[in-house]
């Protein structure tokens, strides 16, 4: 949230911001999970500020991609990221879907017809941006915005 690029100096932004309280990149007091103890504080003080800084740096007509996923400790991370993107001034133009692999060696389930299907994930981290055409599969949305 402290890095502010030069105005309109970037051709593309791709980021996967740290998930509040879920990913710790160090013990320094300036780390976002140390600075912002409450989810709303983190959303407004880190996530929104970071996305606004990306908007400042992006050239007009250029795109940004925000790769996130809901987690148990932050069930609205996807929705909050998308909302912050729009609040910062981005026009939401697309959602790309990143398919998450299943654990290697995970059991496969065979049907009577002999077809194998992936073991269903017991945790649903997808929120309102779940792919309706592939229910039960785990995907992360990558929100695409244009300045």
Go through each PLM region and give its residues.
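Conserved Class I SAM-dependent methyltransferase catalytic core
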Residues: 40-101
